[in-house]
A protein has these predicted regions:
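Conserved N-terminal structural module of periplasmic/extracytoplasmic solute-binding proteins
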Residues: 2, 7-100
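Extracytoplasmic "Venus flytrap"/periplasmic binding protein-like
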Residues: 62-123, 158-162, 260-261, 279-282
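Extracytoplasmic/periplasmic solute-binding protein
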Residues: 136-142, 147, 174-220, 227-228, ...
Length: 333
């Protein structure tokens, strides 16, 4: 249950069944376990959710098939960068596509050798495509995210009952700012939403309205009227107190009742509690609600950002590649 919950909350891509090596005889043996070292970025603490998942794998499928994953809690990429004095390279590691390309795709396992096209079709196409370099699936989509609006459902229910507000209004930025103003008036000057990445939102809104190139030299092109208009929409709402910029991450403002909503990475759902604790120490269920990232009204090019990393494997032996593929199947099923 914990594994499925973690995967859902981390916004992992849908699962699939493994069909590696075209159904050939396995190279794995529980009598002679295959050892895999892994570096990951999902929390450096020993008791991180990812480390608990790896322990669960070792105790179940890993023991059954003869695979043992050894976690190295290290975020320093000096070894992968080939710098002197670094530790031995891991068998499996978290990486962005740009990192994988820099390492040389000839040095990495092509996951297409271990998963069929039908298998990969079960994944979000954009996430899969992001890990393909020169026709090879060298980054396996594991932890991906976009941006969402998170709302305190208990507070929203009262707001909606009094004002007739509807979540569908948040589909556009016009509706978002309209609801933000209405909430501030209803709540006696409390901001509606905390934003984690306000500049990125300004950019996306402008691009959806056909702004074209946003930069001139090393900074924004302030003569770009579409960009200026988008900027002013957010600036006006900030000055009026309809929204605010988060303190690091918007879930803090939502969990303390400072704002009704937070707009940030979908992976932030890991950090939302079951209860909101208000300044007077009263609590109530969060009843978390989600809404998609708003878009510019009438846009012909709606944009959805994606972020996150996948898993790569250094090319060593087919035995280790098969073991890595078995682990990925388990992780994403």
């Amino acid at each position: 249950m914990e594994r499925r919950t973690f995967l859902k909350l981390a916004a992992l891509v849908p699962g699939l069944a493994l069909a590696g090596c075209g159904g050939s005889k396995t190279l794995l043996s529980p009598k002679d376990p295959t050892m895999l070292s892994i570096w990951h970025v999902y929390g450096e603490q020993a008791d991180s959710p990812m480390n608990r998942l790896l322990t669960e794998f070792n105790d179940t499928v890993g023991r059954e098939k003869g695979i043992l994953l050894n976690v190295t809690n290290m975020t320093n990429s000096a070894a992968i960068g080939g710098k002197p004095g670094a530790l031995d390279l891991p068998d499996l590691f978290s990486a962005h596509s740009a990192d994988a390309s820099a390492l040389g795709i000839e040095n990495l396992v092509d996951w297409n050798d271990w998963f069929t096209a039908e298998d990969m079709a079960a994944y979000v196409p954009g996430f899969v495509q992001d890990g393909i370099i020169d026709g090879k699936q060298v980054v396996f989509p594991v932890s991906k995210s976009t941006q969402l609006i998170f709302l305190n459902g208990s507070q929203y229910a009262r707001f909606a009952a009094d004002t007739g507000a509807q979540l569908s209004t948040l589909a556009t930025w016009d509706g978002f700012f309209e609801m933000a103003g209405a909430y501030r008036q209803w709540s006696q000057d409390k901001p509606f939403c905390a934003l984690d990445y306000p500049l990125r939102l300004v950019e996306l809104n402008a691009l959806e309205q056909g702004s074209g190139e946003l930069y001139k030299g090393s900074w924004y092109d302030l003569t770009n009227e579409t960009f200026r208009t988008s900027w002013m929409e957010f600036a006006r709402a900030l000055v009026q107190g309809d929204i605010l910029i988060s303190d690091l991450y918007s879930n803090t403002q939502v969990m303390t009742g400072e704002t009704l909503a937070g707009l940030g990475s979908s992976a932030a759902i890991l950090y939302y509690n079951d209860f909101v604790t208000y300044p007077d120490n009263t609590t109530e269920p969060t009843d978390l609600l989600l809404a998609p990232l708003p878009h510019a009204a009438g846009t012909a090019t709606p944009l959805m950002p994606q972020a996150g990393v996948g898993l790569c494997a250094f090319k060593t032996t087919d035995q280790k590649a098969e073991a890595a593929a078995v682990f990925l199947r388990w992780l994403t099923e």
